[in-house]
Regions:
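Structural microenvironment flanking redox-active thiols in thiol-disulfide oxidoreductases
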Residues: 118-172
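N-terminal targeting signals for export/organelle localization
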Residues: 2-78
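Generic structural signal for well-ordered beta-strand positions
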Residues: 92-93, 215
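Thiol/selenol-based redox catalytic cores and closely related redox-interacting motifs
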Residues: 164-224
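Short active-site neighborhood of thiol/selenol oxidoreductases, capturing the structured segment around
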Residues: 94-123
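Short loop/turn microsegments at loop-to-beta-strand junctions
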Residues: 79-80, 102, 202-204
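A short, polar/charged loop-to-alpha-helix boundary motif
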Residues: 223-238
Length: 243
């Protein structure tokens, strides 16, 4: 069932998340923090809504044509069951890994995207800080395992990269949309031939507890606006008592 849409996904914030969210609001980001689900006092309700009725959204192969029309999982919801190939090509049980340690889960388009490459580098800079807080860092893209390895080697990444070459994970998270026409040949190639529908994920960041519940998210259809490493670290720090 289609959820209510907004171009910028801002919703209710618990008081513990308010400070980090207040800063992030200026990035035209995406927040969902359902105080009712988390049983926390509601500090503020922040909305920037250009509501789109579900029956007006144009769809193809089960996903919207526009990134603004995605229907992502909300804070308080649980992540789906997922097994994805790692850079080595071996199957990685995401749910098992999340159950062992609180997780910062990042969806990016691919190593070919300059904005994604910059984001990956920023994540590497704070990876030790995040692990010191008790988190693990996992990033997922449309790249094939071979291309994930290239990204890891080129940028000297020490955290886990997973391949969502067929966009199955992005679809389950509700962040997949139809890629622009200029990507028609490019996307199947970088995915190892698996992205036959030429889809892309909206760049997203999720903070998860060990139960697999989403505690925080940043989702922005504007591919140039990524959650900075410093702000991610601040958000992660603010949630330490809840993980």
């Amino acid at each position: 069932m289609m959820k209510t849409k907004t171009q910028n996904y801002l919703s209710r914030l618990s008081w513990k998340n308010f400070l980090a969210a207040f800063i992030l609001i200026n990035l035209i980001g995406v927040f969902h923090s359902n105080a009712a689900v988390l049983n926390k006092p509601l500090a503020s309700t922040l909305t920037v809504s250009h509501a789109v009725k579900a029956d007006t959204i144009k769809m193809t192969v089960g996903v919207p044509l526009k990134p603004e029309d995605i229907s992502p999982l909300l804070v308080g919801e649980s992540i789906p069951v997922l097994n994805l190939p790692s850079a080595s090509g071996k199957s990685f049980d995401l749910n098992k890994s999340v159950a062992e340690k609180p997780t910062i889960l990042v969806f990016y388009r691919g190593g070919w995207c300059p904005f994604c490459s910059k984001q990956l580098a920023g994540l590497q800079e704070i990876e030790k800080d995040l692990t010191g807080m008790g988190y693990q860092l996992i990033a997922i893209s449309t790249d094939s395992p071979e291309n994930l390895t290239k990204s890891m080697d080129k940028q000297k990444l020490s955290y886990t990269l997973l391949s969502d070459a067929d966009l199955s994970a992005s679809k389950k998270f509700g962040i997949a949309f139809k890629g622009p026409k200029g990507y028609d040949k490019f996307l199947p190639e970088t995915s190892g031939g698996k992205n036959v529908d030429k889809l892309l994920p909206v760049p997203s960041v999720f903070i998860l507890n060990k139960k697999g519940n989403i505690l925080f998210e940043y989702i922005n259809p504007n591919i140039t606006q990524r959650l900075s490493a410093d702000l991610l670290k601040a958000a992660a720090s603010s949630l330490r008592k809840e993980i």
